[in-house]
């Protein structure tokens, strides 16, 4: 077995073990199903396509570890389905060492390990790095993640499209608020992914910026049912140099519904 394949299997195994162990001692957890629809840019065909995305998302936390996972199934009209997933585990250095690690609005520092997989094209990336946890007024959470971005080849065919390593910076947050007698939440993430060259040939991926803020309204609560179960709203997606393709910029609004359980 090649060294990189061994590292890949080890990384996936450690993430799976972390999820399994921490889920047994979870202090909190949230599981959601998202359904969204909009005209999304295909940066390779250079045109917008009617796309419906079904997302399964889970987050949980214990004293030492926070986990986050999502799996997307995207249906492109008249073309079929593609799949994509991301998973991250973040380890609190303050909790692990038993010492407060804070400064100003930074309330903790953690180590983070992530894996991204585009299953339909059989590509995988590993993202080790660190996390800054912020204590911002009224925010449910706010984090800044800084990781390396490492393409891992999973087959001899994949080696032909092997990428150089780069890095990613991601700010993720949730801000609940009340307005007009209704309960809302503004949440999402914004990331910068540094460009990278292909190891074979002259092709390259450009620097890209992706922002996906969601504005959600608690529809269940508004209708007199239990709060924090059913949301409706909008997701705005801005993507500069989408998927690393130079000049392929996206700015679109998607309809969004969320079931939380």
Predicted regions and their residues:
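N-terminal signal peptide c-region/cleavage motif recognized by signal peptidases
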Residues: 20-23
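Short glycine/proline- and aromatic-enriched beta-strand/turn motifs that initiate or cap beta-hairpins
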Residues: 25-74
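Short loop/turn motifs that connect adjacent beta-strands in outer-membrane beta-barrel proteins
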Residues: 25-29, 64-68, 93-110, 135-144, ...
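Transmembrane beta-strands of outer-membrane beta-barrel pores
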Residues: 35-41, 73-77, 113-119, 148-154, ...
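Solvent-exposed loop/turn segments connecting transmembrane beta-strands
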Residues: 45-50, 75-83, 116-127, 155-165, ...
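Membrane-embedded beta-strands of outer-membrane beta-barrel proteins
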Residues: 56, 87, 128-132, 169-173, ...
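Outer-membrane beta-barrel transmembrane domain signature
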Residues: 151-229, 259-261
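Outer-membrane beta-barrel "beta-signal"
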Residues: 249-261
